[in-house]
């Protein structure tokens, strides 16, 4: 449920205005201009004043009984629905829903163009226009922060860091040895640019290897809460444009992640591995060091990757193997256990 403590409802909105706003919608030829939509709700909870959406076929049954005034459905949807619900066909209902959220709601919290008195900003730092620097933020020498950026309470921006325009850095983030592009979002508690995990063992003693590289983050990247991205030793750690990195992800020194890749929570990528463009790593995936994951490859949740993966391949299991082989192994193992248990009972 959306709380008015945090978000302001901008409704009601005319259904005709919603259709115009979403653009790529196939709607019935005649829609009453006076239909007013007050809110967005899931199918099960929607009232006659609400709009809903169907992006997962698992919930198709609820479309028969929903009370929603309108529902966004897949373009090819031909199933049953409440006759009182106006169906709006979209190529991607979930994407349309995401746009509607911003059409109906605005956050209550605002960020004025201001540097709070408790913030410590070095004289040599450059702060762009219309920036908000929150309480107890520390910005060290020679930092550059682009226009329209937000640095929330308690964050630390180390010497020489460069952050682009329209950044949103949430609370208690620390950033060192990094160059960050435009339109980047970094959620609370993330740590970027710290020393990598590198040691050389000599005569029983683990000697630290200095990491003198940096972290480079491209444009329009989102980094989740409490994620850690280590700087490289000699080679930089690089996150390319459009990447989405979930909470609690560990990215080791010198890792390179290609454009548009998605890394899900609790994944760990060991040093010097390369992830290609538009790859997907499911939750709790482990990638060993010095590997190459090809463009468009996918690793199922909890996959343990110990060797290179070719472009476009889908793997699962630990050690990770082609996904269909993994499914076959799981079925065979289940059958073997069933047979073994039957023999034991006899």
From Swiss-Prot:
What is annotated as the active site? 253 (proton acceptor)
Which EC number applies?
2.3.1.191
**Quaternary assembly:** Homotrimer.
User: Which reaction does this enzyme catalyse, per its entry?
Assistant: a UDP-3-O-[(3R)-3-hydroxyacyl]-alpha-D-glucosamine + a (3R)-hydroxyacyl-[ACP] = a UDP-2-N,3-O-bis[(3R)-3-hydroxyacyl]-alpha-D-glucosamine + holo-[ACP] + H(+)
SUPFAM superfamilies for the chain: Trimeric LpxA-like enzymes
Q: Which GO terms describe its cellular component?
A: membrane
Which keywords has UniProt assigned to this entry? Answer: Acyltransferase, Lipid A biosynthesis, Lipid biosynthesis, Lipid metabolism, Repeat, Transferase
Membership in a protein family:
Belongs to the transferase hexapeptide repeat family. LpxD subfamily.
Which superkingdom heads the taxonomic lineage of this protein's source? Bacteria
Q: Which InterPro entries match?
A: Hexapep, Hexapep_transf_CS, LpxD, Trimer_LpxA-like_sf, UDP_GlcNAc_AcTrfase_non-rep
Q: Which organism is it from?
A: Rickettsia conorii (strain ATCC VR-613 / Malish 7)
Could you confirm whether the keyword Lipid metabolism appears in this record? yes
Q: What is the name attached to this protein's record?
A: UDP-3-O-acylglucosamine N-acyltransferase
Supply the enzyme class, top level: transferase
Annotated GO MF terms: N-acyltransferase activity
Q: Which pathway is this protein assigned to? A: Bacterial outer membrane biogenesis; LPS lipid A biosynthesis
Q: What does this protein do?
A: Catalyzes the N-acylation of UDP-3-O-acylglucosamine using 3-hydroxyacyl-ACP as the acyl donor. Is involved in the biosynthesis of lipid A, a phosphorylated glycolipid that anchors the lipopolysaccharide to the outer membrane of the cell.
Question: Alphabetically, which GO biological process terms does the record hold?
Answer: lipid A biosynthetic process
Pfam families recorded: Hexapep, LpxD
What positions belong to coiled-coil segments?
none
């Amino acid at each position: 449920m959306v709380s008015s403590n945090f978000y302001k409802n901008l409704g009601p909105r005319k259904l005709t205005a919603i259709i115009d706003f979403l653009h790529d919608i196939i709607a019935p030829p005649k829609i009453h201009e006076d239909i007013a939509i007050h809110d967005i709700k899931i199918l099960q909870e929607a009232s006659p004043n609400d709009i809903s959406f169907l992006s997962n076929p698992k919930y198709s049954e609820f479309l028969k009984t929903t009370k929603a005034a309108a529902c966004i459905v897949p373009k090819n949807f031909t199933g049953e629905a409440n006759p009182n619900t106006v169906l709006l066909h979209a190529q991607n209902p979930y994407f349309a829903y995401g746009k509607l959220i911003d059409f109906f709601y605005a956050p209550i919290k605002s960020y004025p163009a201001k540097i709070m008195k408790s913030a410590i900003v070095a004289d040599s730092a450059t702060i762009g226009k219309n920036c908000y620097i929150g309480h107890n933020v520390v910005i060290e020498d020679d930092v550059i922060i682009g226009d329209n950026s937000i640095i929330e309470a308690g964050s630390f921006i180390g010497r020489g860091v460069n952050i682009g325009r329209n950044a949103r850095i949430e609370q208690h983030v620390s950033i060192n040895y990094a160059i960050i592009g435009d339109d980047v979002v970094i959620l609370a508690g993330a740590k970027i640019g710290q020393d990598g995990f590198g040691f050389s063992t000599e005569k029983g003693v683990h000697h630290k290897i200095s990491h003198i590289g940096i972290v480079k983050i491209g444009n329009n990247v989102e980094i989740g809460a409490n994620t850690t991205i280590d700087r490289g030793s000699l080679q930089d750690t690089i996150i390319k444009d459009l990447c989405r990195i979930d909470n609690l992800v560990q990215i080791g020194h010198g890792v390179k992640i290609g454009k548009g890749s998605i890394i899900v929570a609790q994944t760990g990528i060991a040093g010097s591995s390369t992830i290609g463009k538009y790859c997907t790593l499911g939750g709790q995936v482990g990638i060993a060091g010095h590997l190459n994951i090809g463009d468009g490859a996918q690793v199922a949740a909890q996959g343990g990757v110990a060797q290179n993966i070719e472009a476009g391949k889908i793997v699962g299991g630990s050690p990770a193997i082609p996904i269909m082989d993994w499914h076959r192994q799981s079925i065979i193992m289940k059958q073997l256990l069933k047979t073994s248990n039957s023999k034991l009972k006899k």
